[in-house]
UniProtKB/Swiss-Prot annotation:
Pathway: Nitrogen metabolism; nitrate reduction (denitrification); dinitrogen from nitrate: step 4/4. Its cofactor is Ca(2+); Cu cation. PROSITE patterns: COX2_CUA (PS50857), TAT (PS51318). Coiled coil: none annotated. NCBIfam families: nitrous_NosZ_RR. GO terms for biological process: denitrification pathway. Residues 1-44 form the signal peptide. Residues 541-639 are annotated as: COX2-like. The lineage of its organism: Bacteria, Pseudomonadati, Pseudomonadota, Alphaproteobacteria, Hyphomicrobiales. It comes from Brucella suis biovar 1 (strain 1330). This is Nitrous-oxide reductase. The gene is nosZ.
Length: 639
């Protein structure tokens, strides 16, 4: 290890040796209290002293949307800020009973059309779709460094997928599975000139192809970095790298993306993965990679151009940092990038303006580092305000550390200056944190959310499984002040705070919307108009049932099919009243789906049980809601 590196980091052994007791205390929720020192505990009373309040009175609206991931629940949750009220859930990788996501033909098309061939085959006897997902890192699309209100992208760590959500209707319209890659952990989107690319980190290293021919030959294992075209939702290119990729971000100039990396040792056990004093971040030169694709400097693997970006490649640069960095976050000043140490008490600050010289071999990799302040134990993620300050979560300490970037740079040059402004106890063990508009050039410095992994004693006891704790912090003044605790179900890994002026959802579906275009096309082929049709069409043993719905009645009060028919029911909500969603459920047939105003939804099932089966509107849409029903008559097979 060089003298330059030695003086700019605390070794892994020092960290683990000095923090064993604190780590145990942190796991019990006491870490912040034990390390009080310069820390403070600030409560909601601060709001009464002139700070901001989370109160949103009845009839008033929140100023921000917050898009929360849900981890292993597989959905996106929309929360209002500052009230922290949950407004809506968007099913994505999960099966959702309320809306019929995963059951309706429209949702199943989204869930299946982007599957890889081998997984399509794998799922044939498993219902054709994955029933689980692990949704991390929801991030909206950009134009010129700020949100443009078009899309939200997120990743599925469990099944190596990426989704796109339309922000006009708040529904997922595309899901793709990434070839060659094993898991997607970090995901960020191109900020400039627009999105553009969706950058996806492949965390685990596996053989390519992963067909069982190299099970234990770890030299054949590789990690993959993927760029997805956010407009077409197709893989644009991939880069093979050394080590395991963790989190990713990109610059405000459209030139570079960069990922944290752990397991530079390329081991397969915890001890092997932690044996080195250092890992690295990988910087990707987007222009050079695009030129490589254009010039054919790649190997095609599973239909995708894969570029060699391992050590020595002209397409990447590896910058050493302390062991096992986790989050990487670009500051809204467009200059600085912070990699968070996790196993080191430090964060590493890079100046993106130095990356040009780095790729031209005019400077050494560590010359791109401009600060490396020691903040506390377990730094994971960093957010920003509009005053040049950064806010880093300290997992083991159970704290948020507020520090100043320019002072950290001065200290790195040897000046006697402390960049730390404040440490705030949070409850407990924070992971991600996010500031209002803080991932854009329009950061406003008002609010910070700390996504804490444990709630412990903050809420009524609900049994062994307890909620997470999302704490809202006022950062508009000189001191951070906690103003709200919000419980959340498993398990938010990330969130993005977007000002409401950036998003303009509709209240009605357009009849020209592509989401239900297949239903429109089928009705047209049957000579019908979905806005008027209340008919049954038989095609052999396939039966298509068309009906309208207008509260409080379905257009068909009964329909008859034969046992073992394949039945597709199309329901079109012809109401033109805002917030008048209908449902369609068939008793004892496992069928339920949402039908929003002016939308069509469809479901296909086998009528395997003869008898009388009532269907009803599962959404309370009218005073005569209970009477909005009809009969499905299933004639038994003839002997």
């Amino acid at each position: 290890m060089t003298e330059e590196t030695r003086k700019s980091q605390l070794s892994r052994r020092q960290l683990l040796g000095t923090s064993a007791f604190v780590a145990a205390a942190g796991a019990s929720g006491l870490g912040g209290a034990l390390l009080a020192g310069s820390s403070e505990t600030a409560l909601a009373a601060g709001a009464a002293k002139g700070g901001m309040s989370p109160e949103v009175k009845p009839g008033e609206l929140d100023e921000y949307y917050v898009f929360f991931s849900s981890g292993q629940c597989g959905e996106v949750r929309i929360v209002g800020l500052p009230s922290m009220r949950e407004l809506m859930r968007i099913p994505v990788f999960n099966r959702d009973s309320a809306t019929g996501w995963g059951l309706t033909n429209e949702s199943r098309k989204v869930l299946t059309e982007g599957l890889l061939p081998q997984d399509r085959e794998f799922l044939k006897d498993r219902g054709d779709i994955f029933l689980n997902g692990d949704l991390h890192h929801p991030h909206p699309s950009f134009t010129d460094g700020t949100y443009d209100g078009r899309y939200l992208y997120a990743n599925d760590k469990a099944n190596t997928r990426v989704c796109r959500i339309r922000l006009d209707v708040m529904k997922c319209d595309k899901i793709i599975q990434l070839p060659n890659q094993h898991t997607v952990h970090g995901l960020r989107v191109q900020k400039y000139p627009k999105t553009g690319y969706v950058f996806c980190n492949g965390e685990d290293r596996v053989p390519i192809p992963n067909d069982g021919s190299h099970l234990n030959d770890v030299k054949q294992y590789h990690a993959i970095f993927t760029a997805v075209d956010g407009e077409t939702m197709k893989v644009a290119w991939q880069v093979m790298v050394d080590g395991n990729l963790d989190n990713v971000d990109c610059d405000y100039q459209g030139k570079y993306a960069f990922s944290t990396c752990y397991n530079s040792e390329e081991g397969t056990t915890l001890a092997e993965m932690m044996s080195s004093e250092q890992d690295w971040i990988v910087v990707f030169n987007l222009k050079r990679i695009e030129e490589a694709v254009a010039n054919g400097d790649f190997k095609e693997m599973n239909g995708v151009p894969v570029i060699d970006g391992r050590h020595g490649s002209k397409y990447t640069r590896y910058i050493p940092v302390p062991n096992s960095p986790h989050g990487i976050n670009t500051a809204p000043d467009g200059i600085h990038v912070v990699a968070n140490g996790k196993l080191s008490p430090t964060v590493t600050v890079f100046d993106v303006r130095k990356f040009d010289d780095l790729f031209d071999d005019k400077i050494k990799p560590r010359d791109a580092v401009v600060a490396e302040p020691e903040l506390g134990l377990g730094p994971l993620h960093t957010a920003y305000d509009d005053k040049g300050n950064a806010y880093t979560t300290l997992f083991i300490d159970s704290q948020i550390c507020k520090w100043n970037i320019e002072d950290a740079k001065r200290a790195f040059k040897g000046e006697k200056v402390d960049p730390i402004r404040q440490k705030l106890d949070v409850h407990y063990q924070p992971g991600h944190n996010h500031s209002s508009m803080g991932q854009t050039k329009e950061v406003d410095g008002k609010w910070l959310i700390s996504l804490n992994k444990f709630s412990k004693d903050r809420y009524l006891n609900v049994g062994p499984l307890k909620p997470e704790n999302d704490q809202l912090i006022d950062i508009s003044g000189d001191k951070m002040v906690i103003v709200h605790d919000g419980p959340s179900f498993a398990e938010p890994h990330d969130a993005t705070i977007v000002h409401r002026s950036k998003i303009n959802p509709v209240s009605f579906w357009s009849r020209e919307d592509p989401f239900f275009a297949d239903a429109v096309a089928q009705a047209k082929a049957d000579g019908l108009d979905l806005m008027e049709a209340n008919e049954v069409v038989r095609d052999g043993n396939k039966v298509r049932v068309y009906m309208t719905s207008s509260a409080p009645a379905f257009g068909l009060t009964e329909f008859t099919v034969q046992q073992d028919d394949e039945v597709t029911v199309y329901v079109t909500n012809i109401d033109e009243i805002e917030d008048l969603t209908h449902g369609f459920a068939i008793v004892n047939y496992g069928v339920n789906m949402e039908v929003a105003p002016q939308a069509t939804a469809s479901v296909t099932f086998k009528a395997s049980k003869p008898g009388v089966w009532w269907y009803y509107c599962s959404w309370f849409c009218h005073a005569m809601h209970m009477e909005m029903q009809g009969r499905m008559l299933v004639e038994p097979k003839k002997a």
